[in-house]
Amino acid sequence: MEVFTEDWARACCEALNRSEAYRVSAATWEGAIVLAMQADAAQGVDADRAVYIDAHQGACRGARMATGNEAETAPFVFRADPATWKRLLAGEMEPVSAVMMGKLRLVRGNLFTLAKYAQAAKDMVSAAAQVEATFP
């Protein structure tokens, strides 16, 4: 399956729910998260793609492709190009470091809140990396 698709979103949700590390590190987290991948024709991504994750107290209550409105109004929205997402999912880059370097943009949400949940962000990316998927 390809990353940032409906099937991938559901598989990531299942992976989050199997992750004991995520359950513990995100135990007090409340709020939806949108992960957005920017279009980049050179990398085979013809249109923006975004995944909506209903994250609540260490569990994923559901995940799907985000609507246009959700991609702009979710409490936390992260956006990056395909190359950055590939590096994140390969474990070559950590999410908080990527935000600090400007590779992963925090489009919406509070940076101080994100810092408090740095381990949860790492555990979320680690769980998503367990999903066998390909990039376009």
Q: What would you call each of these model-derived segments?
A:
Residues 1-136:
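Feature captures hydrophobic
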